[in-house]
Amino acid sequence: MEMMTRRSFLKITGAMALAVGAAGALSGCDAVDNALGSFFQQYGDQKGHAADSAGSFMYALSNQYQPWSYGEELVLLAVEFQVKNLTNETVTFKASDITSAKIDGHKAKVVLDPKKAANVSGLGKYTPLFDANGTKTYGPGKDLNKAEAGYICFQPEGEAHVSKNWSSLEFTFNLKGKTSTFVMTRNADGSVTSARKE
């Protein structure tokens, strides 16, 4: 399984922008934005990465994750979410825009304070996506060399007993007026693949 590093994310989206950029003079911005988004989704499908877009606002799972457990039980799962904003708009993503989440079929919630929620002393190099208020703002930009990444932290809810050897995460969210569902599957060797659910 090929990992989508930040560098490959930038290369892919940059190459796609150049490939469809020439069409802009002939067909208008909306057509170019839609073509760029469509190519990005197709690339994600081919490489085993959940990827989607709202025009030229593109987002994906990098297939990087970090679990925390107590004994045999999963207490927190952080997954890296990447965004490239090639629009002229500021887009705000809120934790509350994640309308549902499940780990191994059990309800899960987005956690803003891992220390308080799961007694995790810090995410270390895993930068949280959302701030303490549960928001992330993506500024406008046309920089092909800039993508933003951060970790969304999920925790099983209630009495759910999810194994530290979890097998699937599914979450649905609204971003820039579009609803998407991403599914991440953990393989026996610990590697993961992800996909956009139709």
Predicted regions and their residues:
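Glycine-centered tight beta-turn/hairpin loop motif at sheet-sheet or coil-to-beta transitions
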Residues: 54, 107, 175-179
